[in-house]
A protein has these predicted regions:
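Amphipathic alpha-helical
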Residues: 82, 248-281
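Extended, domain-scale alpha-helical bundle/helix-rich regions
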Residues: 235-239, 245-252
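Glycine/threonine-rich flexible loop motifs
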Residues: 311-321
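Short N-terminal or domain-adjacent regulatory/targeting segments
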Residues: 274-299
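ATP-dependent carboxylate activation and anion-phosphoryl transfer catalytic cores
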Residues: 1-221, 226-232, 236-240, 264-268, ...
Length: 362
């Protein structure tokens, strides 16, 4: 919704309400639209009158417990009877988070010999991650790290940095799983925002944000072999650059970046996403753009590391283990903490553990 006008958002909301009223659903329903920014035409792609992967993502992105509310509605309650924190009751709820959420798909074309890396209307992803940050740049870079593909930033993926601008632009003609990384290198080689827009139809805002990251990265790399000025490091961290990635750009040890950052008194803080219609339930995300709001307890704690995105050879069975480990540890009197970045899982439900951190695992 970062680039969709308030007027279009209101139209989408009003049409979704009319659709749900027409089919008579009581509970969770997700309606997916396509909007043509040129003609302003809106098309309904699909309607899922049930809990789905899309509704799970929406629930975790907004802190709105769709499954819990659906159960309350099924039991006979109405929206104006369900309490909802600062909104009073649920009928007055409107998502208004001061953070950015990004979903990034995980593909596995390398696992299938002869498979064509070409994206279209058919789903080819094997998993997905969700990242949260105060800004688009911060959330975007956290999403890349969450994929667990060995990449800690957008640059220098595969051999794209060795290709010319024209070769990179040619690779962008058809959408592939590497499109974001190719765009990044194309911008580094001098491609303009308009050139990338014409090839990809990705809105200018997102390409401009990526261009700013490229320019910032080039500035960081200009200090190769030396210590970064404090103000440059501070801005890099605010924009989501990982210590490990910065160390690669500077050709220094990662611990040198970490030590400099800590000497500056700069560390990530934890911000809550409040779960609507609950008294004090929240989950947390890290940011370098805020103040720490995570309360510390003196209870005995055990942290459970989640499985990350689903992939070939690793699926929901790993999450099953995490969930039951959390439930068993709760019974033993421990405060349980889960760290994960997969919105498809039960482990990232707000009530599976005492504290949930939506974070990259690496």
């Amino acid at each position: 919704m970062l680039t969709i006008s308030k007027e279009v958002q209101d139209r989408l909301q009003e049409q979704a309400y009319r659709i749900v009223e027409s089919i008579g659903v009581i509970g969770g329903t997700n309606v997916q639209f396509a909007h043509d920014p040129v003609t302003d035409r809106i098309v309904v792609i699909e309607i899922n009158p049930r809990t789905s992967r899309s509704s799970a993502l929406a629930s975790k992105a907004t802190g709105f417990p769709i499954a819990l509310i659906s159960a309350m509605l099924a039991a006979g309650l109405t929206l104006d009877e369900i309490p909802c924190g600062k909104y009073g009751t649920l009928d007055k709820y409107y998502p208004d988070g001061d953070y950015v959420v990004i979903k990034f798909a995980r593909w596995a074309f390398e696992k299938f010999k002869g498979a064509e890396d070409k994206l279209g209307t058919q789903m080819k992803a094997v998993g997905e991650v969700m990242s949260i940050g105060k800004t688009y740049k911060e959330a975007f870079q956290k999403a890349i790290r969450s994929l667990e593909t060995g990449r800690y930033g957008l640059g220098y993926a595969k051999n794209f940095n060795d290709l010319s601008k024209d070769e990179l632009l040619k690779l962008l003609i058809n959408p592939t799983s590497e499109r974001q990384f190719i765009m990044y290198e194309a911008l580094r080689k001098g491609a303009t925002v308009n050139e990338l827009f014409e090839l990809t139809k990705i809105k200018h805002y997102f390409i401009e944000q990526m261009k700013e990251l490229v320019e910032e990265e080039e500035n960081i790399a200009s200090y190769k072999g030396n210590q970064l000025p404090d103000d440059v490091l501070k801005q890099a961290k605010k924009d989501g650059f990982a210590d490990k990635y910065i160390s690669k750009l500077l050709d220094v040890e990662e611990k040198e970046i970490r030590n400099q950052r800590l000497a500056m008194g700069m560390h990530q803080v934890w911000e809550p996403v409040h779960v609507s219609s609950t008294k004090d339930s929240s989950y947390y995300y890290s940011t370098y753009n805020g103040k720490d709001q995570d309360e510390v307890s003196n209870n005995k704690k055990i942290m459970i590391l989640g499985g990350g995105p689903n992939r070939i050879g690793q699926g929901i069975e790993f999450d099953y283990c995490c969930v039951h480990a959390s439930l068993a540890l709760k019974k033993l009197g421990f405060e349980t903490i889960i760290v994960n970045c997969n919105p498809e899982t039960v482990s990232t439900d707000y009530d599976t553990s005492d504290k949930l951190y939506f974070e990259p695992l690496t």
